Amino acid sequence: MATLNGTSNGHGKMLSLTLQIWRQKNSKTKGRMEEYKIKGVSTEMSFLEMLDMLNEQLIKEGKDPVAFDHDCREGICGMCGAMVNGYAHGPDEATTLCQTHMRSFSDGDTITIEPWRAKAFPVIKDLAVDRTSFERIIQSGGYISVGTGGTPDANAIPIPKEAADRAMDAAQCIGCGACVAACPNASAMLFTSAKISHLANLPQGQVERHLRAANMIRAMDELGFGNCTNHGECEAVCPKEIKMENIALMNREYFGAMM
Amino acid sequence: MATVLDSKVPSGPLGEKWEKHKFESKLVNPANRRKFSVIVVGTGLAGASAAASLGDMGYKVKAFCFQDSPRRAHSIAAQGGINAAKNYRNDGDSVHRLFYDTIKGGDYRAREANVHRLAEVSVNIIDQCVAQGVPFAREYGGLLDNRSFGGAQVSRTFYARGQTGQQLLLGAYSALSRQIHLNNVEMHTRTEMLDLVVVDGRARGIITRNLVTGAVERHSADAVLLCTGGYGNVFFLSTNAQGCNVTATWRAHRRGAFFANPCYTQIHPTCIPVHGEDQSKLTLMSESLRNDGRVWVPKAKGDKRRAEDIPEAERDYFLERKYPAFGNLVPRDIASRNAKEVCDEGRGVGEGQAVYLDFAASIARVGENVIRDRYGNLFDMYAKITAENPYKTPMQIYPAVHYTMGGLWVDYNLQSTIPGLFVLGEANFSDHGANRLGASALMQGLADGYFVAPYTIGNYLGGTKLDPVTANAPEFGAVENDVNERVNKLLSIKGNKTPLAFHKELGKIMWNECGMARSKDGLESALKRIPELREEFWNNIKVTGEAGEFNQQLERAGRVADFLEFGELFAKDALVREESCGGHFRVEHQTEEGEAKRDDDNFAHVAAYEWTGKSGAQTRNVEQLIFENVKLTQRSYK
Ligand SMILES: Cc1cc2nc3c(=O)[nH]c(=O)nc-3n(C[C@H](O)[C@H](O)[C@H](O)COP(=O)(O)OP(=O)(O)OC[C@H]3O[C@@H](n4cnc5c(N)ncnc54)[C@H](O)[C@@H]3O)c2cc1C
Ligand code: SF4
Ligand code: FES
C-alpha cells in the first residue's frame, strides 16, 4: 500500500504496555505466566495486531512467539479468543478479541492474557485451545436431517418474519467458546441452546426438535461441560449477544423430549 | 508445445446441455459407492457442501481443513447475499438473464456453458438451504425477501442480515456434521494439505501436516477435490482471512494442474482504508452501502479541511459526474479505479489514500432510523474499527483486494488437467471471467458442491478403471519426502527475517505493480523483484520452533514460500495479457475516456499455465472462448 511507506500508524496515540501472558508449550506440560514489555503500540491497532507486533519482537530476541488462534479478524469466524484482564474477549461489550482495539487501553497498563480455561477445552499451546467438544455437540444433533436435493420450493412454507428473526438471532452464534470460559461451571448451555433455539423456531426444525434437544444435551454432559446455575456470565461476555432465554427454551424442548 | 485444452462442453442447445450431460453420465450404483473413497480438501461453502453431498450419496469421504472447525472457513465472512434466478419478485428475472448478467459482468471472459449451468442450479440452492434451516430474511407475509446488487437490473439477491455467508456455511456445516455423525465423512481439522500425490497420471492422494502435532501423513483415495478458496493474500493486505493461501492449488499446479488466469483479481471499492504499517487485514464494507452513500473528494488538491467544513460547491462527486447513468452504482472495477485516480491526483482524504462515502443526503431524505435499519451492523463495525460515527461524519473508504477470479483450470466437469483432481469454489477459475458480480461467489461455491460435483465425480468414478492404490505406494513415499525436506529446509535456514516481513514485502510489490492499474514497466519490475525476494527468502528466512509441534511461524513460512512463486506467474500473466478486461486494467489499453479496452480478436481466451519444472518458466496454453449465445459489446455505464 502506498501509505505503508508514509506516516506509520495514522493518527493513533502510542502506548507502552506490560503484558502478562500464559505460556504453555503443549497440552502435556504445565504452563506459567510470563511478563513482556512492549512499546510503540498505536491505539489504532487491533488487539491481535498488538500480539503480532509482540511476536515479531520476540522472534528478533530469539524467543518463542506466542501461539494464538485467529483467522477472519473481523469478528465472525469464532477462531480467536482469550481472557484479557479476566474478561473473555477483553473489555469491550459484544466484541470479539480480534475486533477489540488498543484504544480501549491506556499508556502504562499491565494486561494479563490467558487462554479459555475449561476441562472440555484443553490447551494446545499458549492461548490456543482445543474446542473439538463443540464439534461433537453439533454432530450429535445440531441439524435438520435432509440430504442433498429433492427439497420443496423455498417459498412452499411461509415462515412468519418474527420467527425467522428469532431463529436468526440465535443462529448468529460464532462458536467461539467465550460463554464456556466465562462460566464458573464451564457450562456449554448458551452455545448449545443457541443452536437448538435457531432450529426450533423454524417449521423445518419441528420434526426432530425433542430428539435433537435430548441428543445434544446428552453430548454436552458426556463431554465434560458443567451445569447451568444461572450466573449469567455467558450472556455478559457473548460477542454476538446470544440471550439466556435460549437456555430456558432448550430446557422446555428437553422436557418435551422426556414426556 | 502448447497443449490443446478440451473443455468437454456437451453438444446441443445451451439450455439443454446440463440435463443431457447428466443423463449421459455414468452412474455408480448405491451399493458400490462405499467402495470408492474421495478426499475433499477445504470445507468452506464449496467443500462442506461437496463432502456432505458425497457422504450422503454413500461414498467414503475424508475431509480436511486447517482451522479447528469447518464452520470457520473464510466463507463465513461473506456479508451481502447470494444470487438465484427465482424470479420471486416477478421483475423479469430468469435463468437466461442471470446467465447473461454474469457473462457480461465478467467482461466476456468466462465459458458460456458453465455459467448457464450455474444460473440453472441457482434456484435449487435456495430450496436446499431453506430445508436445512438457513434463516434467510423474510417479509411480513412469511415469504423470502430480496435485495439488489451491482451489475443487475433485477432484485435476485437472498440474504440473512449482513451475515449471509455465515448462515449458508453453517447450513452446509450442519449437513456435513450429520454425515460425520453417520460415519460417512471422516473429518480432519487443523490439518493442512502440503502436496498432491499423482499415481499413473491420476490424482490418488495427498500429503498433510497435522498442525497440532506436526505429523506428516499420507492419505490415498480414488479422487481428490480441492475446495481451498482464493489467493487474494498474495497481496498481504486483503479482505481475506489470515489463513487464506495458494498452497494447495499451487502444489497441485506443480504436479501438473494448469493454473488459469492468475492475474484476474477483484479489487473491491468500499473497504476501510489502511491505517499503518502494522495493519494485518482490510475490512470490507458491503457493496450495498453504495445504494445510499455518495462518493466524493474535495475539488482542490491537498484540501485538509474536515468534511463538514467543505461546502457543496467545492466537492467533487466524481462517480456521479463521470457516469451519470449509473452514478455511485457502477461496477466494482470502475468504482475502484476512479477512487485510485482521484487519490493519485492528490485529492484523497484522511491519510491521502481514501475517499468519502457520505450518507448525509440519504439521512436527510429518509431519516437516520431507516439508514440504521438498512446498514446498522455495518455502521457499528465501521465505528468499532475507526472510532468514528458514520451517521455524523462520512465514512472513509478505499479499494482493497477482495476476490480472485483466476484459479486452477477445470473443464465442464470441474476436473483439472490431472485426471481425478477436481476443483470447486473460488479455487477454480471457471465462472466469473475477468470480474465477479456481487453475491455470485456464494452461489458458485454451493452450486459446485451440492449440484455439480456429485454428478461429475460419479461419472468419473463410474467410467474409469482405477487400480487399487494404497498410501504405501512408492509415489506417496516420494512426495512425503519432498514435504519433509521442505519443512526441514525452512527450519534450518535460521536467517534474520520473519515470514511476516517477507509476506509484507511481497504484498507491497504486488499492490504497487499488479494492483488496480498495471503497466508494462511495473510488471517487468515485479518480474525482476519477486524472484529476488524469493532468493532472499530461501537464504534469510527465520522460522522459530520445531517441525513436530504446533508452529504457526512454520505454517506462514510455507504459505509465503508458495506465494513467492505464484506472484511471479501472476505478474507474467498480467504482462502477456495486452488488453484491459474486468479487474485487469493495463494502462496501455484504455479508451480516450480512460475506460478499459478489451481486445477480443487476440484475447477472448483463457490463459492456462503449465508447470515445466522451474518457477516463472510455465508454458502458456490457451482455451479459446466461444460465444454462441451472447454478443460481445464494450461495457458502458455512462
Ligand atoms: C469479506 C468478504 C465478503 C464477501 N461477501 C460475499 C457476498 O456477499 N456474496 C458472495 O457471493 N461472495 C462474497 N464473498 C466471496 C465469497 O465469500 C468467497 O469467494 C467464497 O466463500 C469462497 O468459498 P470457498 O468454499 O471456495 O472457499 P473458502 O470458504 O475460503 O474455504 C477454503 C477452505 O479450504 C481450506 N484450506 C485452504 N487451504 C488448505 C490447505 N492447504 N489444506 C487444507 N485445507 C485448506 C480452509 O480451511 C477452508 O476450509 C466475500 C468475500 C469476502 C472476503
Ligand atoms: S453463545 Fe456467544 S460466547 Fe458462546 S460460543 Fe456462541 S457466540 Fe461464543
Ligand atoms: S479472528 Fe475470526 S472472530 Fe476473531
Regions found by a protein language model. Give the residues of each.
Chain A
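Short, structured protein-protein interaction patches enriched in aromatics and acidic/basic residues
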Residues: 67-79
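Glycine-rich phosphate/adenylate-binding loop and adjacent beta-alpha elements
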Residues: 84-108, 113
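Eukaryote-biased recognition of intrinsically disordered, low-complexity regulatory segments
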Residues: 14-36
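Short, contiguous acidic and Ser/Thr-rich linear segments
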Residues: 34-46
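Charged, low-complexity intrinsically disordered regulatory segments in eukaryotic signaling
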Residues: 1-20
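Ferredoxin-type iron-sulfur electron-transfer modules in oxidoreductases and energy-metabolism complexes
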Residues: 45-64, 109-259
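Short strand-turn-strand beta-turns centered on an Asx-Gly dipeptide
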Residues: 22, 38-39, 84-86
